[in-house]
Amino acid sequence: PDANTLVWIAYLKGQSRELKTGEYRFRKGITALEILEQVMAGRVVEYPLTIAEGWTFKQTLEALAAAPKLTHILQGLKPKQIMASLGYPTMHPEGRFYPDTYYYSAGMSDLIILQRAFQKMEKVLEEEWNGRQGDLPIKTRDEALTLASIVEKETGKAEERALIAGVFVRRLRIGMKLQTDPTVIYGIGDRFNGNLTVKDLRTPSAYNTYVIKGLPPT
């Protein structure tokens, strides 16, 4: 049946106002009434988009921009403008979006996906913070997120993270420098060519944990 037939059937059944627009996929041999039921229920085609662990904010935006079925409203916006769209104009975006696979329908905006990832991270972070050990040398949720991001960059193996986190916590307790390469690389940014030099490790920076004590700002 074509679209006009479906609308007419819905009209006869008094349900024309319940039809929901969107992209649908129907199996071969489906009946008109089954199609009508699916359209009324709004069971549209959904597409996956994955935000991987360890991704930078730039990589997350690139994944959103590469999703052809999304409506792209974030392109051309600066990170601060994007965070303002989420209601947090002064918040740094790095590490604020929970790594997971999110599903969207055709025409949905990229901002909605970002909102979902942000809200999920906020929820998880709040739960983890409320259940933390009382004697940790970490004062805020943001510091906890920063430490978790550093640990994640140090190893891709989940079974090693607790051990590495323990090393960093002990260093923080005694006022020792963290001395971790990922923070230095992050501070170098796009200038990093894949090789970390002695000069890089000695160059003062808010992110150079071979120079500063404590955690970097983000």
Regions inferred by a protein language model and the residue ranges of each:
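Bacterial extracytoplasmic/cell-wall-associated proteins, especially those involved in peptidoglycan
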Residues: 68-71, 83-218
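Signal peptide-directed extracytoplasmic domains
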Residues: 1-125
